[in-house]
Regions:
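Extended, highly charged
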Residues: 1-144
Length: 144
């Protein structure tokens, strides 16, 4: 399931919202359903989504029941496969070509007033060291 498929069926918010608490409040107001925000005050020209990769949606993508998901993920961790490498010409991507990246220009929300600032709430880090690969999920504070 690709990203665009994940946002299909999301409730769309066309009015202006702020990354400063508005996105979280709107999510809570609607029971944390998938939401697509079309107009972000602090990030003109950008859209943002929330709540699109839930356990239920993962189960649907893998065509498994919720009770099976942990066992399947555990099996996959114990039985890793090598990635299939493809030629770059066959896998075009958007690349950052800015000299200085400004994370504050993209719609990263400030969820709670108690937080130290804006957080990427579902960052995926893939690290490799000494032949071992680790994938982990993090909340990452944007500092600057």
């Amino acid at each position: 399931m690709g990203f665009r498929e994940l946002i299909d069926g999301s409730r769309e918010i066309d009015g202006r919202v702020s990354v400063n608490f508005d996105m979280r409040l709107e999510s809570e107001r609607t029971g944390n359903e998938p939401i697509l925000f079309r107009e972000i005050t602090e990030s003109p020209g950008h859209s943002a989504v929330m709540n699109i990769l839930t356990r239920q949606r993962l189960c649907e993508a893998f065509e498994v029941q919720p009770g099976e998901l942990i066992d399947i993920l555990s099996w996959a961790m114990e039985n890793p496969s090598e990635p299939i490498l493809v030629d770059g010409a066959n896998a075009p991507v958007f690349e950052n070509t800015m000299d200085d990246t400004d994370l504050f220009s993209i719609p990263i929300p400030w969820h709670y007033s108690e937080d130290g600032g804006r957080y990427q709430s579902a960052s995926i880090i893939i690290a490799q060291h000494g032949g071992l690969r680790n994938t982990s999920f993090h909340r990452q504070l944007v500092k600057g």
